[in-house]
Amino acid sequence: MPKIGVSLIVLIMLIIFLAGCNKNEQNGDETKMQSLVGYVVLKDNERAILITDTKAPGKEDYNLSEGQLMNKFKNNIVIVGLSEIDNTDDLKRGEKIKVWFHTRKESNPPSATIQKYELL
């Protein structure tokens, strides 16, 4: 009898342990998103280039090519993917915006697919 009791206790503990290890937490949108503020200097259907400097880019900066922008604003530029955004019609060059995203890729320049944005 005592062997059955000990075996039963061990079996119950093993089941509890395995159930705890198999717990699959679904964070979904509950995961904390990162954000940043910047100025849209280039935009197409799939992505936009943001300058994250505290002051607005000059008028002449909006006429620069993508390569020229990357050279001029080396550490203050982020490429944001727009694939998760339903409507980007109000997102225009020169707009100051705040964007939210889950992960920023540490490429050169950094990039992120934004989940939402707000015009400032």
UniProtKB/Swiss-Prot annotation:
Signal peptide range in chain numbering: 1-27
Alphabetized InterPro entries for the sequence: DUF3221, NA-bd_OB-fold
Transmembrane segments: none
Keywords: Signal
Protein name as it appears in the record: Uncharacterized protein YobA
Organism: Bacillus subtilis (strain 168)
Lineage: Bacteria, Bacillati, Bacillota, Bacilli, Bacillales
Protein encoded by which gene: yobA
